[in-house]
From Swiss-Prot:
One of its GO terms (biological process) is positive regulation of B cell proliferation. The precursor is cleaved by furin. The gene is TNFSF13. InterPro entries: TNF_CS, TNF_dom, TNF_Ligand_Superfamily, Tumour_necrosis_fac-like_dom. Belongs to the tumor necrosis factor family. This is Tumor necrosis factor ligand superfamily member 13. Glycans are attached at residue 124.
Length: 250
């Protein structure tokens, strides 16, 4: 039997390979993996930069809101808030403000009506020839509101209500008794509200005495109140601290 040749026993392969290992497919896979990793890294970097940019924008917006005390009134600070909601909030705020304004106006009007004040001091005192009385002419020293009006010798009530009324006359007369009468004229009749009587010293140097009266009365619109001294040519002290007349609406 003839001897076998080594060339006949060797495996056959493609021409030019000479029986070596196959390397081209492995190299291609490695290159594709390298490019994929590089592209993934670039995508991650771009996503990170985008997130950082958005985060910085949010931080600037928060800083702006903190600096201005909140979103603007025109709704720019809350872009997600709908226009109907903004209109409803604005309407509610306006209604609340309008109600508050009306309450203040009503309270102010009530205060004006309930706290009319008039304090009068004398200008002079005169006596009528046909009557045994002395009347005092007044002028306002303190006035608040429009419920009272001074008219020469009397005071006209413009606003009906309950009033504190006070009156004082300082006499400088040696007549044995002196006094004052506060009367009201209105609704077709005349009425005495209160009177005061004082005994006077007979010596001229000591003939000083004051007569003070006060009371609470319901006065009607159009009433005229006056102070009368039931003596002709009575001698009075016309200083503001000695003789005065006042009204306070309660």
């Amino acid at each position: 039997m003839p001897a076998s040749s080594p060339f006949l026993l060797a495996p056959k392969g493609p021409p030019g390979n000479m029986g070596g290992p196959v390397r081209e497919p492995a190299l291609s896979v490695a290159l594709w993996l390298s490019w994929g990793a590089a592209l993934g890294a670039v995508a991650c970097a771009m996503a990170l930069l985008t997130q950082q940019t958005e985060l910085q924008s949010l931080r600037r917006e928060v800083s702006r809101l903190q600096g201005t005390g909140g979103p603007s009134q025109n709704g720019e600070g809350y872009p997600w808030q709908s226009l109907p909601e903004q209109s409803s909030d604005a309407l509610e705020a306006w209604e609340n403000g309008e109600r508050s304004r009306k309450r203040r106006a009503v309270l102010t009007q009530k205060q004006k009506k309930q706290h009319s004040v008039l304090h009068l001091v004398p200008i002079n005192a005169t006596s009528k020839d046909d009557s045994d009385v002395t009347e005092v002419m007044w002028q306002p020293a303190l006035r608040r509101g429009r419920g009272l009006q001074a008219q020469g010798y009397g005071v006209r009530i413009q606003d009906a209500g309950v009033y504190l009324l006070y009156s004082q006359v300082l006499f400088q007369d040696v007549t044995f008794t002196m006094g004052q009468v506060v009367s009201r004229e209105g609704q077709g009749r005349q009425e005495t509200l209160f009177r005061c009587i004082r005994s006077m010293p007979s010596h001229p140097d000591r003939a000083y005495n004051s007569c003070y009266s006060a009371g609470v009365f319901h006065l009607h619109q159009g009433d005229i109140l006056s102070v009368i001294i039931p003596r002709a040519r009575a001698k009075l002290n016309l200083s503001p601290h000695g003789t005065f007349l006042g009204f306070v609406k309660l």
